[in-house]
Amino acid sequence: MAYEDLREFIGRLEDKGELARVKHEVSPILEMSEVADRTVKAGGKALLFERPKGYDIPVFMNAFGTERRMKLALEVERLEEIGERLLSALEFRPSSFMDALKGVGMLKDFMSFIPKKTGKAPCKEVVAESLDKFPILKCWPKDAGRFITFPVVITKDPETGEMNAGMYRMQVFDGKTTGMHWQIHKHGAEHFRKMAEKGGGKIEVAVAIGVDPATLYAATAPLPSGISEFMFAGFIRKERLKVTECETVDLLVPANAEIILEGYVRVDEMRVEGPFGDHTGYYTPPEPYPVFHITHITHRENPIYHATVVGKPPMEDAWLGKATERIFLPILRMMHPEIVDINLPVEGAFHNLAIVSIKKRYPGQAKKVMYAIWGTGMLSLTKIVVVVDDDVNVHDMREVVWAVTSRFDPARDVVILPPSPTDSLDHSAYIPNLAGKLGIDATKKWRDEGYEREWPDVVEMDAETKRKVDAIWNEIRNMVL
């Protein structure tokens, strides 16, 4: 049964012993971030701050801070299940990763999850005058101010009319204006550019805060243009998402959201936003970004404010990223059958490092996979790609380091790309959004690749000895471990 709203998810977490109600008075200015940071790094529970200092609206944090809670959020036993459902729905073999996703979007099974319009919307129960009533966090000491960190930002393509839901942080400037930090690779920024090119004065925007977990995840997913995040949320939920019309803009929003902001962004207005302590572990420097002007605010009776804090990994966003890694792996395997597994390490902020294992069948195949990764959707922003054989567990860094140090010759097994598109938050780039890329071939080399020696066998015990020790291991283990 799909979660109707954020509140049902919170209730499920409490039933499962995964929620801590914090009854101490805690300030949304820095203090909540410190509590959440300590909690997530210790693998602790989701947090419901019941007494935010200076406010009467509770704050929900660390919702997705463990693998178990991420699975509870998406209602699956394995995160791969969603990708396997996507794959099984495909009726043709697409020519690219993005074509595969677009193909899913055209299927009857997927189309059955078109959002369901409703006039009865809890998100409209109360009209508010200003953002000032909400306990919006200042996360880190050098942040420029308070930031909305879990907004589902809804825009419409000026050319096609298709709606997009993305997630872009929003610095609060005052009670009626915020920044809109949509980076150049994001669909919100694409809609903004299209409106500017058409000569339009402004683009309408709606923001939903406190949505059900499938909708929040869908807003972060790397979907191509033309695939509705709300439909994808319905696909994940196995139930259509309820949406309602906004009051002052021509957009649809999740009907059961806790808070709705409506307004517009002018194409000719920019304002310096930041610094902000970001998921790379560094402060993003101040930069000019568009300004969101709020025309209408509504919320549910007794709303819950949903927030997150990002910073030096691991943080809560790690499991949103890991969900994407596992959900889209089946489609990546379909496009490139030699791929066995992939790991986007949390410490690499997901877009900085990809470790890929392959079943190697011909010379140069590792390099072929590197170029495939660099040509696939948002994976194209990956800074470093390491390719290993299928006998290496990509999620065990001890095995990965062993493979790199024993199967990689720096003089021969490196691919270096000249400056190419990179993530906007990569501070090592000399020029914003443009940096080199590194590929490391840590597979066993063949004679056809110029390796003139016999590759040595890996040291491992024979099966018969393992069988004998298995029979007595439980007794021995209790003595030695």
From Swiss-Prot:
Q: Which family does it belong to?
A: Belongs to the UbiD family.
Which GO terms are recorded in the biological process aspect for this UniProt protein? ubiquinone biosynthetic process
Q: Name one Pfam family in it.
A: UbiD
Gene Ontology CC = cytosol
**What GO MF terms are annotated?**
3-octaprenyl-4-hydroxybenzoate carboxy-lyase activity
Domain of life of the native organism: Archaea
Q: What is this protein called?
A: Uncharacterized protein AF_0209
Q: Which InterPro entries match?
A: HBDC (IPR022390), UbiD (IPR002830), UbiD-like_C (IPR049381), UbiD-like_N (IPR049383), UbiD_Rift_dom (IPR048304)
